[in-house]
From Swiss-Prot:
It is found in: Cytoplasm. This is Dihydrolipoyl dehydrogenase. Its EC number is 1.8.1.4. It is an enzyme of class 1 (oxidoreductase). Pfam families: Pyr_redox_2, Pyr_redox_dim.
Length: 476
C-alpha cells in the first residue's frame, strides 16, 4: 500500500543525531517525521555501539577490580562467565532505553516511519518497508544516517569468525585466541572486554604512533598498564588469513623491516574505522555534494549545498562522536525554526573507555607546537592523590596545557579511573576562556580525583603544596 505524507521536517536516521534533531524540531513546534530502517530507534550508538560496549566494559572492570582486591585482603573465587545471562542483561538495558525513545517521540507527536529512505527529489523521499511504501514531501530534511564499519577486502569476510564491532558486542562466544586489527578506540575497548572475559588478545596496528591524537606521555602510561593483559603490536599489519586443516584461522603478521610471524586465532575483529552511510540515499540524484572522503559537505549551520537539506553526525566527518552529533542536531533544528544559530564549538572531548580510561580535549602538545603557540605543560601524577591511593587507581595522570602568554588553558588530557567523567571540566574551562588562576582558585572537594585538575593548575601557578614546588624560587 502506498501512502503520501506531508511534513515540515523529515529526519533520516534515528541515532543520537537523528532522534535529538526530531525531538528538538517537535519541541520547536515543527511537524516532524523520523525515518528509521531498523525496528528500534537509537541507531548504532544505543543498539550496537556506545551503550552495549559500556555495559560490557562495566563487567570487565568489575572482574579486574575484584582480582586486584586480594592485595587489600579481600578474596573472590574466579568468576563464572554466563554469556547468555550477560546478553540478556545487556538487552534489557538497550530495550529500556529504546522504549524510552519511542515513548518520548510519541509524546512529542513525532511520526515515526520504518524503512529505508531514498531521495526522489530535493523535496521528497521514498520510504519502503516489508508492508508499505511512502512518499514523504518535506520543506526541510536532515540526514543523520550514521556510519558503518570498514572492511578489509583481502580478508575472507564471508567467514563468520571474522567480526566487526557489532559482532563483537553481540558476545556470541569468548574466543581463546583473539586477534584485533586496529589499535584505535574501538579495538582497545574490545580488547579490554575480551581480555577480562578470558581471551588471549593480540592487537595489530599498522601505524607507528599509538593514539596519535594523544600526547605520548599519556599513552606511555596506558601501554605500561596493559602489558599483563594483552599484546599491542604497532607498525605491524596482517598479510593474509587462511583456514588450517583444523579449521583455525592462520594469520600471517608482518612487522615493518622484520620477518613474518604465523599465528593461529579463533576469531578476528576488524576495527580499522568507520565510513559514512550515504550509499543508499540517492544523493547523486539530487546533486548533494560529498567531499573527497565521502562525507557530506556542510557549513556552520549544518546546511548542505542544497540549503534546505541538512546533515549531522557521522555522515559529516570527524570526529565521529555521539556527543558532537547531538549538539549538531540541536543547532540544525534551531536553524530550521528560524534561529540564527551556528555549530562552532571551541573543543570537542574524546574518550577511550579503556582501563584505565583516556580522555582528552583541546590542543595536544604537538598541535600547540604546529600552531606556534608558546605553551607550558602542567602535570599532576595520581600517585600524589589521596583519593587515587584509597581507590587503588594511582596509575593515572592529569595533564593541562596553558598558553604562556595569556595563562589560559588550551588543552588537557587525563588517564585514569573515570577520566571520562573528569574531562568535561577542562572542556568547559577552555570554552569559557579560563586561565590557570580561575581553575586553581575554584575550590574542589577533597579527596576526589577531580581535584587533580585544580592541583595541576596550581603546579602551573607555582602555588602547589601537594607536590614539591619547582617554581617557588622563581616566584620569590
Amino acid at each position: 500500500m502506498h501512502q503520501e505524507i506531508q511534513s515540515e521536517v523529515v529526519i533520516i536516521g534515528s541515532g543520537p543525531a537523528g532522534y535529538s534533531a526530531a525531538f528538538r524540531c517537535a519541541d520547536l513546534g515543527l511537524e516532524t517525521v523520523l525515518i528509521e530502517h531498523q525496528e528500534r530507534l537509537g541507531g548504532v550508538c544505543l543498539n550496537v555501539g556506545c551503550i552495549p560496549s559500556k555495559s560490557l566494559l562495566h563487567i570487565a572492570k568489575i572482574i579486574k577490580d575484584a582480582s586486584e582486591l586480594s592485595e587489600s585482603g579481600v578474596f573472590f573465587n574466579k568468576p563464572i562467565i554466563d554469556i547468555k545471562k550477560i546478553n540478556n542483561w545487556k538487552e534489557k538495558i538497550i530495550k529500556k532505553l529504546t522504549t524510552g525513545l519511542s515513548n518520548m517521540g510519541e509524546k512529542r507527536k513525532v511520526r515515526i516511519v520504518q524503512g529505508k529512505a531514498l531521495f526522489n527529489t530535493d523535496h521528497s523521499v521514498l520510504v519502503k518497508n516489508k508492508k508499505n511504501d511512502f512518499t514523504i514531501f518535506f520543506k526541510h530534511a536532515i540526514i543523520a544516517t550514521g556510519s558503518k564499519p570498514i572492511k578489509i577486502p583481502s580478508l575472507p569476510n564471508e567467514d563468520n569468525r571474522i567480526w566487526n564491532s557489532t559482532d563483537a558486542l553481540s558476545l556470541k562466544s569468548i574466543p581463546n585466541r583473539f586477534l584485533i586489527i586496529g589499535g584505535g578506540i574501538i579495538g582497545l575497548e574490545m580488547a579490554t572486554i575480551y581480555s577480562a572475559l578470558g581471551s588471549k588478545v593480540d592487537i595489530v596496528d599498522r601505524f607507528n604512533a599509538f593514539l596519535p591524537s594523544v600526547d605520548k606521555d599519556i599513552t606511555d602510561i596506558y601501554i605500561k598498564s596493559i602489558k599483563k593483559r594483552f599484546k599491542l603490536l604497532l607498525n605491524t599489519h596482517v598479510k593474509s588469513v587462511e583456514k588450517s586443516k583444523d579449521n583455525d584461522l592462520i594469520v600471517k603478521i608482518a612487522e615493518e623491516n622484520s620477518d613474518e610471524n604465523v599465528c593461529c586465532y579463533d576469531n578476528i575483529l576488524v576495527a580499522i574505522g568507520r565510513s559514512p552511510n550515504v550509499d543508499f540515499l540517492g544523493l547523486e540524484k539530487i546533486g548533494l555534494k560529498l567531499n573527497e572522503s565521502g562525507f557530506i559537505e556542510i557549513n556552520q549551520q549544518l546546511k548542505t549545498n542544497i540549503s534546505h537539506i541538512y546533515a549531522i553526525g557521522d555522515v559529516t566527518g570527524f570526529p565521529m562522536l555521539a556527543h558532537k552529533a547531538v549538539q549538531q542536531a540541536h543547532i540544525a533544528a534551531e536553524v530550521i525554526s528560524g534561529k540564527k544559530h551556528y555549530f562552532e564549538p571551541k573543543v570537542i572531548p574524546s574518550v577511550a573507555y579503556t582501563d584505565p580510561e583516556i580522555a582528552w580535549v583541546g590542543l595536544s602538545e604537538k598541535e600547540a607546537e604546529n600552531n606556534d603557540i608558546d605553551y607550558e605543560v602542567s602535570l599532576f601524577p595520581w600517585s600524589a592523590s589521596g583519593r587515587a591511593h584509597a581507590s587503588n587507581c594511582t596509575l593515572g595522570m592529569t595533564k593541562l596545557i596553558f598558553n604562556k602568554n595569556t595563562n589560559k588553558i588550551i588543552g588537557g588530557s587525563i588517564i585514569g579511573t573515570n577520566a571520562s567523567e573528569l574531562i568535561s571540566e577542562i572542556g568547559l574551562a577552555i570554552e569559557m576562556g579560563s586561565d590557570a588562576e580561575d581553575i586553581s582558585l575554584t575550590i574542589h572537594p577533597h579527596p576526589t580525583l577531580s581535584e587533580s585538575i585544580s592541583l595541576a593548575s596550581e603546579v602551573f601557578q607555582g602555588t602547589i603544596t601537594d607536590l614539591l614546588n619547582l617554581k617557588k624560587s622563581l616566584l620569590n
